[in-house]
UniProtKB/Swiss-Prot annotation:
It comes from Hyphomonas neptunium (strain ATCC 15444). GO terms for biological process: translation. SUPFAM superfamilies: Ribosomal protein S2. The gene is rpsB. One of its GO terms (molecular function) is structural constituent of ribosome. Pfam families: Ribosomal_S2. Belongs to the universal ribosomal protein uS2 family. This is Small ribosomal subunit protein uS2. It comes from the Bacteria. One of its GO terms (cellular component) is cytosolic small ribosomal subunit. NCBIfam families: rpsB_bact. Keywords: Ribonucleoprotein, Ribosomal protein.
Length: 263
């Protein structure tokens, strides 16, 4: 599987070049701005193309070495494409409110994930006999809340090797936690962003739904390319969803074994 390709035309059609209003900008993005039109900054896609390519290469290589990737996008227009992309390539995501400490306090988050798994297992097995209707309803609500917050990372099994971020301003806490832990940040950088927030950043619109979907799909394809490299010769068909799911399951099992060994 080849590294996902994209064209300047695709970027233009998705509106990647449109930035924010000129009064809403970060001066550090000046080198990546081509000009302005009707009070809107226009980004220079000649910078976007190589930077996006470099970001895709990094993600592919990270996965090929066995690393996990966490997609982060909690703004309304990013929620669905972020979840769909992560699920398609057997990776992980957070697309609702970022919980402070998700990365920097992973042990506590792991306990909440364990509780989510236990509740899922209980309801799937028809358990809960002996509980009152109110108790069952309370547990259902607890499970739903945990699923919404942590469902996308329930099988991650440990810290990611990289995070892919849509809107570094919106996801400032996630970016801060990743940088504190030395986890590389891959991110789209709109004209109101600080380019120093990303280790692998590329100039682009972080609000348009078409642009966000394009980024997410490209990174999902890069992950699949990395998985193909890491499983070369193992007889795994990445075209089969069951095989992709099995890779994720194996990743979680390995992480659990590593954690047990460290205990």
């Amino acid at each position: 599987m080849a590294l996902p390709d994209f064209s300047m035309r695709q970027l233009l059609e998705a509106g990647v070049h449109f930035g924010h209003q000129t009064h809403r900008w970060n001066p550090r993005m000046k080198p990546y701005i081509y000009g302005e039109r009707s009070g809107i900054h226009i980004m220079d896609l000649s910078h976007t193309v190589p930077a996006l390519h470099q970001s895709l290469v990094f993600v592919r290589d990270t996965v090929a070495k066995g690393g996990r990737v966490l997609f982060v996008g909690t703004k309304r227009q990013a929620q669905e494409p972020v979840a769909e992309a992560a699920q398609r390539c057997a990776q992980y995501y957070m697309n609702h409110r970022w919980l402070g400490g998700t990365l920097t306090n992973w042990s506590t988050v792991s306990n909440s994930i364990k509780q989510l798994r236990e509740l899922n297992a209980m309801f799937e097995s028809g358990g809960g006999s002996g509980l009152t209707k109110k108790e069952l309803l309370d547990l259902q609500r607890r499970r739903d809340k945990l699923q919404k917050s942590l469902g996308g990372i329930a099988d991650m099994g440990g810290l990611p090797a990289a995070i892919v971020v849509i809107d570094t301003n919106k996801e400032a806490i996630a970016v801060q936690e990743a940088r504190k832990l030395g986890i590389p940040v891959v991110a789209v950088l709109d004209t109101n962003c600080n380019p120093s927030d990303a280790d692998f950043g590329f100039p682009g619109n972080d609000d348009a739904a078409r642009a966000i979907s394009l980024y997410c799909n490209l990174f999902a394809d890069a992950v699949l390319d990395g998985l193909a490299e890491s499983t070369a010769g193992l007889g795994v068909d990445l075209g089969a969803s069951a095989d992709i799911a099995s890779l994720a399951d194996a990743d979680v099992k390995l992480a659990d074994e590593e954690a047990a060994g460290e205990a």
